Amino acid sequence: PTNNRWKEYYRVIANANNILKLIDPSSEDPANLKYRAIALGFRGYAYLQLSYLYQHSYYTGADGTKWGRGEKYDFSQSPCVPLITEDTEGDQPRATVAQIYEQIKSDLTTAFDLFKGLNMTRTSSATDMDGCVVAMHLARANMVIHEWDEAIKYAQVVIDNFPILQSEDQILQGFSNISLPDVVFGSDITADNSTTYMSFFSQMDTYGDGYAGIGVWRAAFKPLVDRIADTDIRLQWFCCDRSTGVTDASGNRITLIRDTQSPVAVEYQAVKFIGTGRDNIKAGVFSGWELGDYIYLRSEEAYMIKMEALAHKGSAEAVTELNSFMKTRQPDYNYTFTNKADLIEEIIYQKRVEFWGEGLEYIDNRRLNIPVDRTDETWGAENNNHFSAGKFRYNQEDRPFLYQLPLSEIENNSQLSPSDQN
């Protein structure tokens, strides 16, 4: 329900506002500066998340791409969500998208500057809200509003502080350990805080006893995987004939779940996320799937934001950045520039593979005007492994992408009426 997301992010905003009310903004006390930075960082993040859901993107589309501009394109003056800060009194109407982004940038840039002044650009713990976490969200926000130089600036902060995953062991670990070198922000999951069957790994881990392991299979879109090169390590995230196919004693081809002798439940079944970690699976240990750490931000995103922003600017450096990144996934990768639109499409495709199952495609589709197209007419019935109800096409300016405002908000906020509903 859309009410869940609304409450989640406004709870973050309320907590941040309560902290900010207690701190004198002119205070130079390091403890006060730290807590002010943390509160502003979380508030900016929460408004950014709300902006993705309750209105169309600031701009739908960008010039020089295959997808172009949406029909309306500029939603900056459209109503978004109520803007509430520590100084706000009384009910508030829906602020415009532009007003929300002004607040996002103000909160996050102030937080970043405070963290930098406190030598907290990167702290020792991946669970900390710090300067790099804020920088990643600033990079995301600036991509939405086409501030390419600012996006590069803040992406570079993360790049300067974090490597990307390099080895096959790291890339295939299972994304369940916040000690991985690319983890910018995450949560340490233990027996005390695991939600077990309500957890991320219950939903995504093929090897566990959660939903994804006992019948609610997670599979990737066939055309997405079929485009991955044989030499790309990431192909091994998906079980298909090219990655885990074998010939049985009868001469029949079967696809196995990676690192096991068990056949897949469905072709293209995903094994990217492994709660207990791949080393345990290879050793025959399948327990502990519910203890996988949550990884919220990975450094690879900053590298890909930078290369995309460079491409939008028409910089040849974008190809250099893309090739450098991709050689860690596919050693024989070598992209040759033809035109800007194709380059941006290639970057977005590789980003979609890299972050499969991590939620970034939704954000990128919104800001780049990429339709969600799962129809047989486009892909061919033989290539479309979506179930029938999932075979649809929507453009980014279509209503299904707009979350509804909770009825409780409309009923209890004196500045809203039913006519304010999306």
Predicted regions span which residues?
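Hydrophobic-face positions in mid-chain alpha helices that act as interaction patches
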Residues: D128, I152-I295, S299, E354, ...
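Conserved, well-structured interaction surfaces
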Residues: P1-H56, A95, D113-F115, G288-Y294, ...
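Short, surface-exposed recognition loops and adjoining beta-strand edges that mediate ligand/DNA contacts
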Residues: Q55-Q77, G117-F200, T336-A341
